[in-house]
């Protein structure tokens, strides 16, 4: 990502009284400073690493790539997300990490924009590819031969990303997780459930009406499905993992964390409104696409105002309903819906035009995180008022 707020360092002189010295950074004053260093997009760390060994820079790129799945450009958040994946399943964490590494190396070999690589934008799609290939593998955990197709499909992600960016940049639109959707759909279509080497889990369409009893609805399970919905962005159904992911998002941006939770909640509401099987709702299948959509529209690619906040809620609901339609459609050919609903719905909302000045689409080159995006929007609005011509 691009700009971030400038951190101002204030050093107080050391006070010497006899033999006692008072540190310039003590207790409560030091903590906010340290916290400010690890929040947002940690641009200061990226700048400090520019003259450091390339191995340290590469680790930073990988961690940012892991966190960019949820639009977070923060290596500490990447560490937390990796911890969450380890809590869910160490094998999934390994395949996701491997996919990110291979994709980032491939982007370097293809001489892609170094600033985009450093922000993790050539790694996050392969993170999902690696994790979801393990999730959908019918061979179970630690099927080591799976690492070969994980590497192969991860290498396609920078190609998809670069090609899609060439097209979508004409409208100043992001590629989102379209490369992941393309790569995973291609892999699952080529292998399928009956492949002797790399069989995938069987995806079948619904052929009978679900037996819904509203008296069986559990408020506790619905509450747990909020973090589970966020966790399902990475294919995880553990509520503790989802909670760790929310914490990782919170570290970078409280506004993003809020919209992630709201989006998951709206997905649950959409599922209940269509009498979806409770197991699907508890499993987070109704929450992850709407959570991504709510984050994207709620301050990330649209400057946050009350108007865009309401637009984000509408986009989240629209995404949830589109998701069940696409899931039913794609199940006919044995494929999961992945994050196709999020990509298509959110791109549709971003393309939308309006004369309302409070609905402001962020220039893609200026997108950082919601709090900083809003500062940019207010400054741009002030400049327009001061010099309308």
UniProtKB/Swiss-Prot annotation:
GO terms for cellular component: basolateral plasma membrane; plasma membrane. The chain crosses the membrane at residues 53-73, 91-110, 116-136, 143-163, 173-193, 242-262, 281-301, 310-330, 333-353. It comes from the Eukaryota. Glycans are attached at residue 211. Inhibited by phloretin and para-chloromercuribenzene sulfonate. It is found in: Cell membrane; Basolateral cell membrane. Its main location: membrane. Detected in erythrocytes (at protein level). Expressed in spleen erythroblasts and tumoral kidney. It catalyses: urea(in) = urea(out). It is a multi-pass membrane protein. Keywords: Blood group antigen, Cell membrane, Glycoprotein, Membrane, Transmembrane, Transmembrane helix, Transport. GO terms for molecular function: urea channel activity; urea transmembrane transporter activity; water transmembrane transporter activity. One of its GO terms (biological process) is establishment of localization in cell. Homotrimer; each subunit contains a pore through which urea permeates. Identified in a complex with STOM. Belongs to the urea transporter family. This is Urea transporter 1. It comes from Homo sapiens (Human). The gene is SLC14A1.
């Amino acid at each position: 990502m691009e700009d971030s707020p400038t951190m101002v360092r204030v050093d107080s002189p050391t006070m010497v009284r006899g033999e006692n010295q008072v540190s310039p950074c003590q207790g409560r004053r030091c903590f906010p400073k340290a916290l400010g260093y690890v929040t947002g997009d940690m641009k200061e760390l990226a700048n400090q690493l520019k003259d450091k060994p390339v191995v340290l820079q590469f680790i930073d790129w990988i961690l940012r790539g892991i966190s960019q799945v949820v639009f977070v450009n923060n290596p500490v958040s990447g560490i937390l997300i990796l911890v969450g994946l380890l809590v869910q399943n160490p094998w999934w964490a390994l395949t996701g990490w491997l996919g990110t590494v291979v994709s980032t190396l491939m982007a370097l070999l293809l001489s892609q924009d170094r600033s985009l690589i450093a922000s993790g934008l050539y790694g996050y799609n392969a993170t999902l590819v690696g994790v979801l290939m393990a999730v959908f593998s019918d061979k179970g955990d630690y099927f080591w031969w799976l690492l070969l197709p994980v590497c192969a499909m991860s290498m396609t992600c920078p190609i998809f990303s670069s090609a899609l960016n060439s097209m979508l940049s004409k409208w100043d639109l992001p590629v989102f997780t379209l490369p992941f959707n393309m790569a995973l759909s291609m892999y699952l279509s080529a292998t399928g459930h009956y492949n002797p080497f790399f069989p995938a889990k069987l995806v079948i369409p619904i052929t009978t009406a679900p037996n819904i009893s509203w008296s069986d609805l559990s408020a506790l399970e619905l509450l747990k499905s909020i973090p589970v919905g966020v966790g399902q962005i990475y294919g995880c159904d553990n509520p503790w993992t989802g909670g760790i992911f929310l914490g990782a998002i919170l570290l970078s941006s409280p506004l993003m964390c809020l919209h992630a939770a709201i989006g998951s909640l709206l997905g649950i509401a959409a599922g209940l409104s269509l009498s979806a099987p409770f197991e699907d709702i508890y499993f987070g299948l109704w929450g992850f696409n709407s959570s991504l959509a709510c984050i994207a529209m709620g301050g990330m690619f649209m400057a946050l105002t009350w108007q865009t906040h309401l637009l984000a809620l509408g986009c989240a609901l629209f995404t949830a309903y589109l998701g069940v339609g696409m899931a039913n459609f794609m199940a006919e050919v044995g494929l999961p819906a992945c994050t196709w609903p999020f990509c298509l719905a959110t791109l549709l909302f971003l393309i939308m035009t309006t004369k309302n000045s409070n609905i402001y689409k962020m220039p893609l080159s200026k997108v950082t995180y919601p709090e900083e995006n809003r500062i940019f929007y207010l400054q741009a609005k002030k400049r327009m008022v001061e010099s309308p011509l």
